[in-house]
Design a protein with these regions (language model features):
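Conserved alpha/beta enzyme-core scaffold
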Residues: 1-285
Length: 285
């Protein structure tokens, strides 16, 4: 697929005339967020998480709370995010409630110290729960995209997560357009708009790994977009640490179970999972 952009500057990746009129700085966008709001932000690990607006919001929270305020928000994401998002907001004690998953040490301390409510819900359940209204109202979606087409379609960034649901359910939308993300992301994604909530849900029509059942773009109601923030910052990815755990039954070492045939496996997060995954390279094929 031919990409719309090459190496355009951040503002040049906003081709929709109506949305070009809403371009502003991260600080201006953060000023539109009020205490008590629930925010749905992009990000599945640090990949595709907004960078500029969360940090600007953290500065706004810190300044208001230093003057006796109690500025806090609820934060929903696709999964764990980054130091620029989770870390920045947690350091200023700005998160009242967090879901569905986190791995930031400052967030973890806030939760364990009782300063942050945490809903430890399975990632795959979040979108459906939001559609059913179980988790309450979503005020603002803050979504990183790689570009905006003339008709307002959004080129997803390096993750999708719950972005489709946030864009559809939120009252207002803030878009971070990150020109540091490769233009070649256009066409990579497969966003499926045929799903429905139970009892009207039907099987997803995908039978083979190379099937494409959706489209490469996200959609949103342009009238809900209150800010477009150009940015140029790469995802911050942490390096894997060397496994340092003893696995029960592994005689003090992490060992892969012998198997006659390789089976499908889903590798999770943490030292134990890294240890298991690292041992797979030593298994006979």
């Amino acid at each position: 697929m031919q990409t719309t952009f090459t190496h355009a500057s951040p503002a040049d990746r906003v081709l929709c005339p109506a949305l070009r009129e809403r371009i502003m700085t991260a600080d201006q966008a953060a000023s539109l967020i009020q205490s008590g709001m629930t925010l749905g932000m992009s990000g599945f690990t640090p990949a595709g998480a907004p960078k500029s607006v969360p940090q600007a919001l953290a500065r706004r929270i810190e300044a208001q709370n230093a003057n006796g305020g109690n500025f806090r928000i609820s934060l929903w994401t696709g999964a764990s995010t980054s130091a620029e998002l989770d870390g920045a907001l947690a350091k200023v004690h700005g998160i009242e409630r967090r879901l569905p998953y986190q791995s930031d040490p400052t967030v973890r301390k806030e939760i364990n110290d009782g300063r942050m409510q945490y809903v430890d819900i399975h990632l795959s359940h979040v979108a459906q729960y939001v559609w059913f209204g179980f988790l309450g109202h979503l005020d603002v979606a803050v979504i990183e995209v790689a570009g905006i087409l003339p008709d307002g379609r959004l080129i997803p960034s390096t993750s999708v997560g719950n972005n489709k649901t946030w864009l559809e359910q939120a009252d207002k939308i803030i878009l971070e357009v990150n020109s540091a993300q490769p233009a070649e992301l256009e066409g990579m994604h497969d966003i499926y708009y045929g799903a429905a909530v139970p009892p009207k849900r039907k099987p997803i029509p995908m039978e083979h790994p190379f099937d494409r059942i959706g489209e490469p773009y996200l959609h949103c109601d342009l009238s809900k977009v209150i800010a477009v923030v150009p940015t140029q910052q790469r995802d911050t990815l942490a390096a894997f640490t060397a496994p340092d755990v003893d696995v029960p039954g592994g005689h003090g070492q992490c060992r892969a179970r012998p198997a006659a045939r390789a089976a499908a496996a889903a590798i999770g997060c943490g030292q134990y999972c890294q240890c298991r995954a690292g041992r797979l390279e030593h298994r006979p094929v």
